[in-house]
Amino acid sequence: MGLSLEQKKAMVQEVAAVAKEAHSAVGAEYRGLTAGQMDALRQQARENGVYLRVVKNRLAKRAVEGTEFECMQSELTGPLLLAFSLEDPGAAARVIKAYSKEHEALQTRLVAVGGQVYPASELERLASLPTREEALAMLLATMKAPVQKLATTLNEVPGKLVRTVAAVKDAKQAA
């Protein structure tokens, strides 16, 4: 049984609201996955802050209208599931990439970031982006390195003096 007009409108509104908040989107063909495998994929997506939904292409085109993912409209053909990254740009790509390694039936068709559509081959680059926490840790380490090096250098001068005095003391005691 098909969806009623009200259900379709609600679905379009839901996907449009998610698309407005999302950082990136991945479209993947799910033909060949069982219901159990789809449930496992949905569970994995939820755990990683990814909105995953199978939407009819016509409804998906309406949902992404007016968002930065409007560029995807021409690519929405065939049985696709849409995965939107809500927390960090690489989350959806990491989920789809990891799941497609286990299940070859899941084929990435498109990747959209920043108002541009990229081929499926760019999934690897998007998946390798660091999470927000990892990026902040890398930035902090980069900022901390010069200060730490300066502190070590400044600490070395008195340390060298202490070692020299200790060596002179040992030499006098030995003599």
Curated annotation (Swiss-Prot):
SUPFAM superfamilies: Ribosomal protein L10-like. GO terms for biological process: translation. One of its GO terms (molecular function) is large ribosomal subunit rRNA binding. HAMAP family: Ribosomal_uL10 (MF_00362). Forms part of the ribosomal stalk, playing a central role in the interaction of the ribosome with GTP-bound translation factors. Belongs to the universal ribosomal protein uL10 family. This is Large ribosomal subunit protein uL10. It comes from Alkalilimnicola ehrlichii (strain ATCC BAA-1101 / DSM 17681 / MLHE-1).
